[in-house]
C-alpha cells in the first residue's frame, strides 16, 4: 500500500507569547518571555509565584458567552486555536465530506481547575449534602475538547484525545498523520491544549521540586542548557495544526506551510518522572522518527528540543542528540522555545511543532533565551549550537520536534519544506 503524503495547511495558537500564530512567531523570533507573576490565584503561600499565563485574550471574541461558561479554560483554548486554524486553512466546508474530517487533540491533565473548584465547594459544604454543577463532569474530562470541536463543525471522522503527559499533543499529531497517510481521513484538526495554572497544578509540581523558584526575575527563570537552571515554568494555552492529505489540499488550492514526513514514539521504561540519564528513550524516539521519515541525520537542520530547563532532562537530551546525529549534530541548530513560552504540558507538542513548521517555512530558528556566557554546565557540550539568545537565519530544509512526558513517554515529529 502506498502511503499518502500529509501537509500542514492551517495553524492556530493561544500561547503566553501571543494569541495568534503570527504574534506567537514574531515574539519567539524576538526572544520575548511570557513569564510573569501569577494572576489566576493567590500565590502568597506558594514556593513558585510566577508562570506563563495566556494574556489579553477575550474568550467572547470567539465563543458564545453562555457556551463558554460550560467549558473549562483548557477547552476554551482548544476551541479558539481550532477556530483560528480552520479559518487559516481556507476551507469551504459546504462541499467537504465531513465524515472524513477528524479531530485528534492532546491533553495532559484536562479540567483540573474545574475539579479543584467543585471538590473545594463540596468539602466546604458537605453538611448540606452533595451539590455539584451539572456541567462538572463534561467540563472536567480530558476528551471533551476534541468532542466540542467536532460538535462545532459537524466533523464525523476519527475523534479522540491522546494523553501522554507532556508528549500528548505530539502523539496527537503522530496519530493524525498516520490516519491520513493510511487513507482513514482526508484531514485532521490536530493539536493540544492545557490550563493547569491553579493552586492544585502549581502546588503539585512544587511538591515534586519540578518548578523554578526564581521569583525575583520570572522572565529569566527558564534557561535550558544553562548551569543555573532550576526547573521549568508552568504555562498554559493551545496549538492547532490542520493536517491534510496532499492531493485533497491541492484540489482546493490550499496554501501549504510544510509537509509532515515522520513521527516516532518510544518509552524510557526508567522512572515515573525523571528522564533516562543517558537519554535512551530520547535517542530511540529520534531514530524512530528519522526512519519513519526516510531521512538521514544530515538532512535535519533544526531540532526544537524538549528542553524544559531541568537538570537531568537537558543533559540527557543533549547526549541523545549527539548519539543520533553524530558529526551532523554540530551542523544543525537546536533551540528550546520553552525558554520563552514556559512548559505548556499537554499543549507543548502542538505549539512546538508549529514553531518547527514556521522555522522550516521562514528559514529562521527561534532562540533559546536566558543563557549567559559564564553559565555553562560541564556535562553539556557547548560545541552544539543551542541558538542562544538570538534567532538565527539559515536554510531549514527539515526540522524535528521532541516532547518527553512523565511516565517515560517520548514523541518526535518531523517536518520538511513542501516540494511538489
Can you name each region flagged by the protein language model?
Residues 39, 184-230, 263-277, 307-314, ...:
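Acyl-CoA/ACP chain-elongation machinery
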Residues 1-8, 95-98, 293-299, 330, ...:
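Flexible, low-complexity linker/loop segments at domain and module junctions
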Amino acid at each position: 500500500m502506498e502511503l499518502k503524503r500529509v501537509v500542514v495547511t492551517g495553524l492556530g495558537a493561544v500561547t503566553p507569547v501571543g494569541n495568534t500564530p503570527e504574534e506567537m512567531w514574531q515574539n519567539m523570533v524576538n526572544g520575548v518571555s511570557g513569564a510573569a507573576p501569577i494572576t489566576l490565584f493567590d500565590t502568597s503561600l506558594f514556593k513558585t509565584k510566577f508562570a506563563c499565563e495566556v494574556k489579553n485574550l477575550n474568550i467572547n471574541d470567539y465563543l458564545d458567552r453562555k457556551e463558554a461558561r460550560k467549558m473549562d479554560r483548557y477547552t476554551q483554548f482548544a476551541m479558539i486555536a481550532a477556530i483560528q486554524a480552520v479559518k487559516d486553512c481556507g476551507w469551504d466546508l459546504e462541499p467537504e465530506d465531513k465524515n472524513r474530517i477528524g479531530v485528534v487533540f492532546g491533553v495532559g491533565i484536562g479540567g483540573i481547575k474545574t475539579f479543584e473548584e467543585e471538590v473545594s465547594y463540596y468539602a466546604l459544604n458537605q453538611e448540606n449534602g452533595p451539590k455539584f454543577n451539572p456541567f462538572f463532569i463534561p467540563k472536567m474530562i480530558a476528551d471533551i475538547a476534541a468532542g466540542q470541536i467536532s460538535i462545532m463543525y459537524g466533523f464525523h471522522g476519527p475523534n479522540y484525545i491522546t494523553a501522554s503527559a507532556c508528549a500528548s499533543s505530539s502523539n496527537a499529531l503522530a496519530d493524525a498523520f498516520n490516519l491520513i497517510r493510511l487513507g482513514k481521513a482526508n484531514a485532521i484538526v490536530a493539536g493540544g491544549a492545557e490550563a493547569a495554572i491553579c493552586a492544585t497544578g502549581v502546588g503539585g509540581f512544587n511538591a515534586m521540586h519540578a518548578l523554578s523558584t526564581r521569583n525575583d526575575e520570572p522572565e529569566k527563570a527558564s534557561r535550558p542548557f544553562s548551569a543555573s537552571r532550576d526547573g521549568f515554568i508552568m504555562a498554559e494555552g493551545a496549538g492547532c495544526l490542520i493536517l491534510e492529505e496532499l492531493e485533497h489540499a491541492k484540489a482546493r488550492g490550499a496554501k501549504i506551510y510544510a509537509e509532515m514526513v515522520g513521527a516516532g514514539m518510544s518509552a524510557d521504561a526508567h522512572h515515573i518522572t525523571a528522564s533516562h540519564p543517558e537519554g535512551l528513550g530520547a535517542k530511540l524516539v529520534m531514530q524512530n522518527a528519522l526512519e519513519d521519515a526516510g531521512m538521514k541525520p544530515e538532512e535535519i537542520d533544526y531540532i526544537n528540543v524538549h528542553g524544559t530547563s531541568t537538570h537531568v532532562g537537558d543533559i540527557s537530551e543533549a547526549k541523545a542528540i549527539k548519539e543520533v546525529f553524530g558529526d551532523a549534530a554540530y551542523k544543525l541548530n537546536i533551540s528550546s522555545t520553552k525558554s520563552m513560552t514556559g512548559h505548556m504540558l499537554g499543549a507543548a507538542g502542538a505549539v512546538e511543532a508549529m514553531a518547527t513548521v514556521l522555522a522550516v517555512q521562514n528559514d529562521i530558528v527561534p532562540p533559546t533565551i536566558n543563557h549567559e556566557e559564564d553559565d555553562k554546565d560541564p556535562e553539556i557540550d557547548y560545541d552544539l549550537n543551542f541558538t542562544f539568545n538570538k534567532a538565527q537565519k539559515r536554510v531549514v530544509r527539515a526540522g524535528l520536534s521532541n516532547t518527553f512526558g512523565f511516565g517515560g513517554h517520548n514523541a518526535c515529529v518531523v517536518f520538511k519544506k513542501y516540494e511538489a
